[in-house]
Structure formats: structure tokens, C-alpha cells
Amino acid sequence: MTTKTLWRVSNGRILPVTRRSFGKGLAGIAALGALGIRSGEAQTRKRGGTIRVAYVGSPVKLDPHVATGSEEWSMLRAVYDNLVWTDETLSPKPELAESWESTPDAKVWTFKLRKGVKFHHGRELDADDVVFTFNRIFNPATASPARSVFSMVEKVEKVDPLVVRFSLKSPFAEFAQLVGGSFQAKIAPRDVADLNKTPTGTGPFKLTEFVPGDHVTLVRNDAYWRSGEPYLDQIRIVYLPEEAAHVAGLMTGDLDMSWWPSAEVIPIYQANRDITVSIAQSYGYQPIIMRVDQPPFNKPEVRRAFRLICNRDSLRKIAVGNLDVPVSNDHPIPPFSPMYMEQKPLAQDIETAKKLLSDAGYKDGMDIEMMAWTGRAGLVQAALGFQDMAKRANVRISVNTVPADIFLSKYWLKHNFFVTNWNGRTTLYEMLALAYQSDAQWNESQWKSKAIDDLIEGVRREQEPAKRKAVFAEIQKMFIEDSPAIIAYHRPSVMAYRKHLKDFVPHPSGWLDFRTTWLG
């Protein structure tokens, strides 16, 4: 086994499995770990072959501008391109736009498109497609979550067939990173009526088959604009809700990759010399959300009490094991960010939590349901960990777990108390604007604050690094004072794959970029 370390990784023990049912399902499989046979190292890239990638959750939406789940974004990355590619270091690189420039005040951005790029249905990309894409995102009827993220755009217009200009209402120095990193900013053709039924991009693979809850088939785009790429003939993404099946498949070679394995199975993969485990630093996090517009969390005392119930270091270890992930402090800015304000995380204080609950009218504690969804490593573990902590404060939590598709359609943005998952974006501005701007479609907590809105706008407007960091510090202070979420850790992006999968570059956002990948 080799471990490709893109971030800090502990070589020590991962926390042992605490759920007997899961442990029994993996007990026999773990013994296979020592049976891997080291394959030879090929020196040149080879063309051809099919790889099988396992997801725990299943994609639901195929429209790139309204896709909600991580399974959708990661898979659609193979079908579509953005104007700009934000690479694994979060640096903007040319993609459909071969170059770009901005005015000195960063309010007007001009992108020059590549000539001869073809959509999967055969027509060449032009500026009208880019204008169509962004106007579709801006249209309230589309209900794209990216609409709030791009609220600074006053207009997008065609300059000539291969040049597009964005005029902004206010300066934004990271606009290129935003169009490259936004999950929903994938360029789509203006002449395809239903992108959910007919996903049509310019990407390295074409989507030829989608069976909800079962599999997705992607085939090589022979007309891809990057010469010689991709190398693989086909990618088959299979839906396997039981992670034990992922482990068995990787051990036997029936699978080539498991997308985002949990902390419980990482030691099993690490024990097999034919499997690589990669870990990429990420802005992603898994918050416990409290809806401030619904009881009991419409009372600030209750929100504060729940935050004081949490032992953040313990919750981090329960959710991500011994991965070297720093403790966070109930806001989206991770400790490894240059914008992070040094601070001591809120400490657990059960007695104060009890008093706050009593002051809020819950002198005998409370009974409450917490929703969590299966299919994403860490979520159920975090819910059960917090449930156990809350008992000491006489808070009796019943954890209700459902599959991701049911959670996202019936409970997310509706229930008053749940744990969810945020993939890391490529800018901190986007992380904030998507979830904490008052009018954001994905404002899970319904925490609406003009002060926060003004600060998010300040992050976007401010160009001078020191002043920008000061704005981020004010945002963090407001979260520390009255966060609508318990954010105990920022989870890295983890992939496990067979060693014969060559030149796969893990991305912090969990995207599957198979353009240069080949089978050795």
C-alpha cells in the first residue's frame, strides 16, 4: 500500500469501529488486507480500459446549474468544463477560456475562449453559450444555488464570437477563481432543451447511461479539446450503499476506486499494498445545523447551550478518526487558511449549558430529533457522538438516519436540527455566500444578519490583503458569538483506489478529474 499525502496525515491508529453492526460487516474483509500483490510500474501512459468507481450515495440531478449533491458535482466534472480550471492547489488555470484579464479596479473581467472546442452533440462552443449559461444561473426561475454567489455580476455580454465580458457591481479580485471553482458554473450549450435529461458538455467524457440508484456510465469524448486526453475508454460509477461492499470490491479488484471512504475503513485500505489512500486539504466541513427560525433554536440561549454541550476535539475524532484534522470553532474558516483568526475553540461546559436551557424554559432538558444522512463519511458518526454528549445536559436526542436522496428532498432546508456535509469550494467567499448570506438559497439555518451580509460583501470588495483579513476576522467573531451551527472540524477529501490507477490527481473539492488517468 502507498499513501499519497497531499496534506498532513497521521500514520498512527485510526479510532476503532464503535458500531458493532459495521464491525461485523468488515471483520472478514480486513483479513484480506495483507493479500495484495504489488504490480509493476509502467513508465508511459496507456490508452484504453474501463474503471469502476463506487459511491455510497446515488446522483439524483443531472442539470449542472441546479445539482445539489456531491455525487452529482463530482461526476458532472467529467462531463462539463468551466471557463477556468481551479487546480488541486486552488490556483486558477486556463480551461475553456485560454486567457482572461481584468481592469485595475477588478470590476470588468474579459475572457477569451478557445477556438474549436466542441460540445458532445457536435456544435462548437462560442460566446453565446457562456452568456446563456450565466444568464440561466442568474434567472430566479432556474433556482440555481449559484445565483447568490454571483450576485455581484451586473451583466455578462458577448464581445465577439470568442470573447465574453463580465461587468461587476463591485470589485472582486478572485472572480477568475469563482468562475473556475463554482460547482454550478459549468458551461452548457444554449440549444439543449433539458439538461437534466440530456447532459451535454465539452468535458472529457460523455454521459451515456444513468440508472438512478444503480449506476452511471461515462464514455471517452474522442473530440476532447485537450489533445490526447482522456486515456480511459469508460468510467462506470456504481451505487453501493454498504461500505463493506466497497472494501470487498477494492480488495478483490472488482472496483478501482472508493469515493470518500469513512475513517473506519481507512486502516483496512492502508494495510493493503495494492491500494493508495489520498488525502487532500479542503475547506469542506460537516456542520450540525440549528434552524434559528424554528423552536427551540429561535432562542439564542438554546443555540449557545447546544454549542457548549459539544466537545469539539472528541467529535472530530469520532467523525474523522486519527486523520490530522485541526479542531474548528463553529465557523467556515478553517484553521489552515491564511484568513483564520487565531482563537481558542469554545470549550465544553455542561453546567452552563444546563443553566442556559433552564433559563430558556427547559429546566428538565428536552427531547429532540436530529436528522443525519447515510452515504457521507462522518455524518452519522458525528450525530451519534453529539447525541452521547448531550445526555449529560439532559438533552435527549433521537438520531434519525435516512439515505442522502431522501434527506435532501424531504429534510434538508426544512428540518430544525440536522447534520450535513459541505464540500470545500475554491474561495472562502463562496463558502460564506452559499450558506450564510441572508437571501442564499442554501441558507440552511435561516440565520439572517445584515451585519454578516455586509461583511460578506466586504470580503468580496476589499482588495488589500491585510484589510481583507480584518474583514474575515470580524466574520469569525460574529460566528463565535452566535453561530447557528456547530462546526467542530474541517474534513479533508479522501479517496482510496487501486495502485494500477495512474496519474489520478485528487482534488480538495472531491471532483473526479480523470483527464490524465490511465490504467497501468
Model regions: which residues?
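N-terminal secretory signal peptides
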Residues: 1-18, 28-30
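Gly/Pro-rich hinge or "lid" segments in bacterial periplasmic/extracellular proteins
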Residues: 87-91, 172, 177-236, 242-244, ...
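Extracytoplasmic/peripheral linker and loop segments enriched in polar/acidic and small residues
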Residues: 392, 396-407, 431-499, 520
